[in-house]
Swiss-Prot record:
The keyword Ribosomal protein applies. The keyword RNA-binding applies. This is Small ribosomal subunit protein uS8. Keywords: Ribonucleoprotein, Ribosomal protein, RNA-binding, rRNA-binding. It comes from Pyrobaculum arsenaticum (strain DSM 13514 / JCM 11321 / PZ6). Belongs to the universal ribosomal protein uS8 family. The gene is rps8.
Length: 130
């Protein structure tokens, strides 16, 4: 099986585990972008503890699920977004105001759309979660 997008694969694994009611999920393969995205989800209370396990083949993450995710997914293609346009993308991907987050890769790291608006920076849309 050819893995084209590691981040998309990780988000789909989380979504499937949430639907099945599991308490933890093992994400493999991983990269730094996946880790930073998981950290944003952890900061906003969508996932619990994130543990890295070095298995000699690139490693994997064991993520504790809290049952708070209704929907999660990658945004493909990865649209570039200016900070003034973030509200329009919120309306497109999130169900209502103040519900859920967009994950954005910026020049200052991977952040949520809330942090990007506060810092007045744009970036590339990676994922949505609510």
């Amino acid at each position: 099986m050819v893995m084209l997008d590691i981040l998309s694969n990780a988000l789909i694994q989380i979504k499937n585990a949430e639907v099945m009611g599991k308490r933890q999920v093992t994400i493999w393969p991983v990269n730094k972008l996946t880790y930073y995205t998981l950290r944003v989800l952890q900061r906003y209370g969508y996932v619990g503890e994130i543990e890295y396990v070095d298995d000699g083949r690139g490693g994997k993450y064991i993520v504790q699920l809290l049952g708070k995710i209704n929907d999660i997914g990658p945004i493909r293609p990865r649209y570039p977004v200016k900070y003034r346009e973030i509200v329009q993308w919120e309306q497109k991907f999130l169900p209502a105001r103040q519900i859920g987050i967009l994950v954005i890769s910026t020049s200052q790291g991977v952040v949520s759309h809330i942090e990007a608006k506060e810092k007045k920076i744009g970036g590339v849309l990676l994922a949505y979660v609510y």
